[in-house]
Amino acid sequence: MARAKFERKKPHVNIGTIGHVDHGKTTLTAAITMALAARGGATGRKYDEIDSAPEEKARGITINAAHVEYETENRHYAHVDCPGHADYVKNMITGAAQMDGAILVVSGADGPMPQTTEHVLLAKQVGVPAIVVFLNKADQVDDPELLELVELEVRDILDKYGFASDEVQILSGSALLALEALVENPNIKPGDSEWVDKIYNLMATVDEHIPTPKREMDKPFLLAVEDVFSITGRGTVATGRVERGTLKVNETVEIIGLRDTKTTTVTAIEMFQKTLDETIAGDNVGILLRGVQKKDIERGMVIAKPGTILPHTLFEGQVYVLTAEEGGRKSGFFKGYQPQFYVRTTDVTGKILDFSYIKQRNPSELSTMHSNPMVCPGDYVNMKIQLITPIAIEKGMRFAIREGGRTVGAGMVLEILES
């Protein structure tokens, strides 16, 4: 069956749900798709359709299982919801780099929890530009003053991590009650249910308060590979978000990082099971590659315009080391420390060869007097980093440092140190 063409009629925005486990991220995602489906702007997706990842689909290109698409009157959205917690933080570092904005879901009944803070911090680190807050489970809160207290707590967290809280819109509702009303009557009209109306109100707020991003269309094409599928009779497909530039079918690209660079031709491009002649920055797409085996390409590589980015292992980075309160280490570390470096969609072990202080949290501590200086939680430092595997990196790129399931630091590449 021939695939329909994707028609670009509205601006495309990538959005995601973030927040503490069990505060209702996936329920809210389901409620949004079903509410917009009632107005013809989406295919309704029930909770279990979002929460269970369909395995590779032999018939077509499946973009990462947690992506759903929907439309409001003004925009086309791709929505990412990553339910599992351990993967969530990992996906936030790789996936949040793809968000143009986020809906922070906080249970009005429970208030902010440790992961609420962690996700706000991560959103800031990876450059999510705007947040709208949804206080969920409002039906379980009898006293409106309690919701106001939760709102104040959330604003404090947003302020602490550099989101101007007085500009952030905070709405309340019940994703579950909205979803139940929509399951009972999929053709519900605005005005029929206060809970469904609160979902419409949320999306109107997202339309207005999460700015349409300025895409880097004039830069050379680059896509970080998120997933790879092999489609019988068609070849190998790499999926991911176009970080910058544009790409047309039949153009030549390079596959860079983790192993030797390979050159190939693009034979097809698809988005949400529709074909494209050209993909542009911001799209979540699948790219069919000529003559590439599934074993030749993996998550963490990049597909780019030939000659525009190179793989490297040695660079200098500027890093903020998280405190224990921010979810980081309790103790400091020395030269020779070997954590994981998360860059785009990949994580690679690296060694900290050297460092110099930019700003210390407690400069009077013995750390500087010691013959073997130590990096302490809360410090800002410049680091010289050696990765064990070459990956596509460039000046100005952000990365996260993780160890044993926790984020240790957040940084930016200052300089590539080898040819």
UniProtKB/Swiss-Prot annotation:
Record EC number: 3.6.5.3
Major location (coarse): plastid
Domain tr-type G: 10-214
Keyword Nucleus: no
Region (G4): 136-139
Catalytic activity: GTP + H2O = GDP + phosphate + H(+)
Family matches, as InterPro entries: EF-Tu_GTP-bd, EF-Tu_GTPase, EFTu-like_2, EFTU_2, G_TR_CS, P-loop_NTPase, Small_GTP-bd, T_Tr_GTP-bd_dom
Location within or outside the cell: Plastid, Chloroplast
One annotated Gene Ontology cellular component of this protein: mitochondrion
UniProt GO BP: mitochondrial translational elongation
GO molecular function: GTP binding; GTPase activity; translation elongation factor activity
NCBIfam families for the chain: EF-Tu (TIGR00485), PRK00049.1 (NF000766), PRK12735.1 (NF009372), PRK12736.1 (NF009373), small_GTP (TIGR00231)
Protein name: Elongation factor Tu, chloroplastic
UniProt organism field: Stigeoclonium helveticum (Green alga)
Taxonomic path: Eukaryota, Viridiplantae, Chlorophyta, core chlorophytes, Chlorophyceae
Gene responsible for this protein: tufA
